[in-house]
């Protein structure tokens, strides 16, 4: 197996290029790749309006939104409630004029909450803010689906911006600080989101988004033309618990860790999950279809767990030819005391369905 070093592609597998891109910036995850990666692959692989692209771990919706820019049909699966919500909110066909009226209505609303906020949430906000958030959420939930999703995402973003919450791995800590007035922040975010919809030119195609395990996808055999995805990284399970505040703000029900791919800390269990996923991916792809899988070595307290050889073996046994393995990033794996254990690689695997 040949591994080619391509550090020039390193930023493409991070969310950094999309931090200023309209709509993409509404919500990003630490391990998200960029729209630049998806758009580049769509062009290189000649994907068009008659193509179907699948992202079995759709995350923050980057693949789906990039395909919408190109007018390409796409399907996204995930089991994380927040990922499903965000992916759908980013890719709907919105009536911007209608949204403007709804935004005005919500910004002027004075509503009492129908329920009290859970006790655990109050430590993360200035006094009184959770009740104000719940009151507005009640008003938003009366709206039609598209308007409701747009405004709920804006509400959650504003609430987090005005909170005392600070994410430290999988732990949500409290850092009390002075925050700007909530209504002022909410107004700025919602107006910015409206402007994003005007700025990002997309086609009216809407992706299909479903809650579905990537090892059991709901697609006919041989139906997809390409896959662009990034499974959860080995040992990187923080995303399972790190967003519980956002889930509460959006009214979502958290899933148990056992429901997630790679949720077990055992490397062999992770590679077993990967084998199941690769077999399912091979089943739904057309012969000759190309796939891009972004994955990384795992960091444990014992050192670096290399994945490239195992991924190569799994791909070959599942019906793929490995066309390229690109090492695009390397980061030090360290102990909590910052002792260096080795360098962990981040890779782009290009596979072809045999």
Annotated model-derived regions:
Residues 141-145, 160, 275, 279, ...:
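A SAM-dependent methyltransferase catalytic signature shared across enzymes that methylate proteins
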Residues 130-229, 234-241:
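SAM-dependent nucleic-acid methyltransferase catalytic core
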Residues 25-29, 116-128, 263-272, 294-309:
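Acceptor-substrate binding/catalytic loop of class I
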Residues 1-48:
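S-adenosyl-L-methionine
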Residues 81-143, 251-260:
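Conserved phosphoryl-transfer catalytic core
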Residues 226, 232-285, 289:
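SAM-dependent methyltransferase catalytic-core segment centered on the flexible catalytic loop
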Residues 299, 304-305, 312-314, 320-354:
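Class I S-adenosyl-L-methionine
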Residues 38, 51-67, 74-80, 87, ...:
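Conserved proline-anchored active-site loop of SAM-dependent methyltransferases
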């Amino acid at each position: 197996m040949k591994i080619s070093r391509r550090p020039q592609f390193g930023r493409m597998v991070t969310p950094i290029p999309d931090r200023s891109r309209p709509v993409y910036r509404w919500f990003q995850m630490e391990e998200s790749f960029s729209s630049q990666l998806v758009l580049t692959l769509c062009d290189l692989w000649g994907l068009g309006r008659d193509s179907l692209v699948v992202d079995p771990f759709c995350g923050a919706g980057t693949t789906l939104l990039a395909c919408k820019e190109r007018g390409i049909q796409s399907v996204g699966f995930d089991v994380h409630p927040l990922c499903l919500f965000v992916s759908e909110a980013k890719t709907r066909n919105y009536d911007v004029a209608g949204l403007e009226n709804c935004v005005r209505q919500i910004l002027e609303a004075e509503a009492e909450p129908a329920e009290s906020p859970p006790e655990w949430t109050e430590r993360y906000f200035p006094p009184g803010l959770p009740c104000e958030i719940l009151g507005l959420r009640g008003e938003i939930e009366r709206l039609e689906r598209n308007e409701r999703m747009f405004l709920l995402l804006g509400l959650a973003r504003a609430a987090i911006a005005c909170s005392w919450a600070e994410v430290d791995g999988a732990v949500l800590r409290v850092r009390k600080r002075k925050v700007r007035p909530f209504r002022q922040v909410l107004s700025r975010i919602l107006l910015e989101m409206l402007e994003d919809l005007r700025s990002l030119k997309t086609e009216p195609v809407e992706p299909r988004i479903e809650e579905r395990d990537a090892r059991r996808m709901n697609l006919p055999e041989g139906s997809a033309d390409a896959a662009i995805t990034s499974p959860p990284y080995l040992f990187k399970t923080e995303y399972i618990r790190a967003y519980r505040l956002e889930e509460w703000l959006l009214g979502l029900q958290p899933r148990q860790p056992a429901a997630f791919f790679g949720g077990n800390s055992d490397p062999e269990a992770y590679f077993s999950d990967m084998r199941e996923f690769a077999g399912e991916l091979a089943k739904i792809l057309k012969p000759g279809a190309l796939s891009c899988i972004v994955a990384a070595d795992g960091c444990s307290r014992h050192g670096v767990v290399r994945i490239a050889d195992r991924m190569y073996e799994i791909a070959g046994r599942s019906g793929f030819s490995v066309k390229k393995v690109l090492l695009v990033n390397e980061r030090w794996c360290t102990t909590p005391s910052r002792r260096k254990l080795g360098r962990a690689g981040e890779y782009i695997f290009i596979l072809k369905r045999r």
